[in-house]
């Protein structure tokens, strides 16, 4: 059976007090943008629910899109019937018969107290009808049913909702401002971007390329990752590609090998901060996880952080690698991230990088060359590209 409409529940948004309207309006806007392929949909925003009227749209296709909307706690497919219990019983039996689940529960709510039958009596009557009209073995499970059917008897009609479908959770994207994601092409940074979006912070991305040491396949890999992330936002993400080759070679020419990674990261942060401020981003975001590599010890993070004044968000900071991989597989970025194309951080990896660097030593290496000119040149020559649904057809990207 095709559903008539979808009931969307907000979750964390219910705790937002006076800001509640701002959050729900943002969620409505984001939902409309993600469901733009279904122009026939109509929306009704109420205090604690969003009703989406399908008007013939396939509810299964809409369901898949709704699963990517941050700020949605859960949703249910719903059906509207005239106030004829026999019609409702037949419809529910058909729904359960079309499903493969073996346990179910009927939960009736009556806002129309003039309806002649009580909720418990309706539950028993519908369940009995289901047992007589479904051609497989079924059981009622009132505690943990595989299929929950909610029947709401209102003054205008009877409404039936099937299983509660889990939403993406979090807050509506954009409600928390915007940050600049340092996207390398590895496993961790796309996950960091996803988790940032989940907390309502919109993102732009910066990628550091080092041609000819990094190739067009590494570039394609990054844009494919962005294409996955854009499905969790308003359909497009801006990417800033920095040509890092000259500055990276200068770092390795003027620094002891053990400090090259530390100084290189400091240069990236300087460039990232300038791009963030220029593009109205309030923070940097990266995929650093404590102790994972030499540049991600607390000592290293402290020395690297000192060169900028804006915050650095590290959403995967305390996650194990396997936990990060689980999320990457869930959001479909893992297979892209493990493509064998190196980024600028891996092609020049020193054999014995400092794990407890000192800021005065990093500064001593930096004063031996005019790094500010290189940094400014990187910012001035940045390549900015918007990744949207048509990016694969954009010859300027590849």
Which residues make up each language-model segment?
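Conserved G/P- and acidic residue-centered "switch" motifs that form tight phosphate/ATP-binding loops
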Residues: 186
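RNA-binding accessory domains that recognize and position tRNA/RNA substrates
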Residues: 1-180, 190-238, 242, 306, ...
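Active-site adenylate/phosphate-handling loop in enzymes that bind or generate adenylated species
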Residues: 125, 129-130, 137, 164, ...
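Small/polar glycine-rich anion-binding or flexible loop at a beta-alpha turn
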Residues: 292, 340-348
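Short, cationic low-complexity segments
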Residues: 178, 365-383
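A short alpha-helix-loop-beta-strand transition element characteristic
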Residues: 332-340
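Generic beta-strand/beta-sheet core signal
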Residues: 11, 163, 206-208, 242-245, ...
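S-adenosyl-L-methionine
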Residues: 230-256, 260
């Amino acid at each position: 059976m095709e559903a008539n409409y979808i009931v969307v529940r907000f979750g964390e948004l219910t705790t937002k007090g006076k800001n509640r309207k701002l959050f729900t309006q943002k969620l409505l806007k984001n939902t409309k943008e993600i469901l733009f392929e279904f122009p026939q949909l109509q929306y009704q925003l109420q205090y604690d629910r969003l009703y989406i009227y399908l008007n013939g749209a396939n509810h299964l296709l809409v369901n898949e899109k709704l699963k990517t909307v941050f700020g949605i706690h859960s949703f249910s497919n719903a059906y509207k019937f005239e106030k004829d219990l026999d019609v409702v019983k037949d419809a529910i039996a058909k729904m359960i018969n079309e499903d493969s689940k073996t346990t179910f529960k009927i939960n009736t709510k009556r806002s129309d107290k003039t309806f002649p039958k009580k909720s418990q009596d309706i539950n028993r009557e519908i369940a009995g009808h289901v047992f007589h009209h479904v051609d497989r073995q079924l059981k009622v499970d009132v505690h943990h049913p595989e299929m929950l059917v909610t029947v709401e008897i209102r003054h205008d009609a009877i409404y039936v909702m099937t299983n509660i479908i889990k939403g993406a959770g979090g807050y509506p994207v954009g409600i928390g401002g915007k940050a600049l994601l340092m996207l390398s092409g590895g496993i961790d940074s796309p996950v960091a971007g996803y988790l940032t979006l989940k907390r309502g912070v919109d993102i732009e991305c910066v990628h550091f390329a080092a041609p000819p040491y990094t190739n067009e396949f590494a570039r394609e890999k990054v844009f494919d990752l962005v294409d996955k992330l854009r499905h969790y936002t308003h359909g497009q993400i801006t990417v800033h590609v920095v040509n890092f080759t000259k500055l990276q070679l200068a770092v390795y020419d003027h620094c002891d090998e053990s400090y090259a990674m530390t100084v290189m990261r400091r240069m990236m942060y300087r460039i990232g901060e300038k791009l963030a401020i220029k593009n109205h981003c309030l923070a940097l975001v990266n995929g650093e996880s404590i102790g994972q590599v030499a540049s991600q010890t607390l000592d290293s993070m402290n020395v690297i952080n000192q060169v900028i004044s804006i915050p650095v968000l590290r959403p995967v900071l305390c996650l194990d690698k396997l936990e990060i991989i689980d999320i990457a597989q869930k959001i479909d970025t893992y297979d892209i991230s493990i493509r064998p194309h190196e980024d600028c951080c891996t092609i020049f990896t020193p054999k014995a990088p400092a794990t407890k660097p000192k800021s005065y030593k990093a500064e001593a290496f930096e004063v031996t060359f005019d790094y500010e000119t290189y940094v400014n040149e990187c910012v001035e020559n940045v390549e900015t590209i918007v990744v949207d649904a048509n990016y694969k057809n954009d010859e300027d990207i590849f």
